């Protein structure tokens, strides 16, 4: 293979992309992983004791939850989420009061190109819902905003999808650092759907077949490796 032939093939490929013949690479990734717990202060202390990194308080969500955050590097962060003091019901998050240790409860996938993200999912046979706006107020009084959507035929192991407002700094760049994501493992009875999702978005996750849904987060932190 000559240098000239390689250059010719590259030029042809770039021309196809420019003409819309093939889709450019989609920058989709695991945006954040959620660890649920019954009390946020307890969760912050437990995480710091286990890892050597203290999560920073993020703020309150309109729906009755609040959170603390840790950067996991490379555009991914960890969200510890709990009910706000005095809140007894927060819809889908009401079950947080039953969690007495930090427990993986969900995950999100992000992309800066919402239209392409939805297109890829649709092409893989995964229909999506309409976007819903979301927000959080920081301790400094700033409002962070985003849009989320999910799969129409949702299942327990599935992520939700998030597109951050252009004016909102990503939490991975503003939260305490020191921990790195080593592995995000998702298992459940919808293995085929998980594999479709992983392939469509080229996600770096591990998936497995199981009767019951389970999620496992492995980190490398200042005090060593830890798994939740």
Regions found by a protein language model. Give the residues of each.
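A basic- and aromatic-enriched beta-loop-alpha substructure that forms the phosphate/nucleotide-
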Residues: 83-117, 121
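Bacterial N-terminal signal peptides
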Residues: 9-21
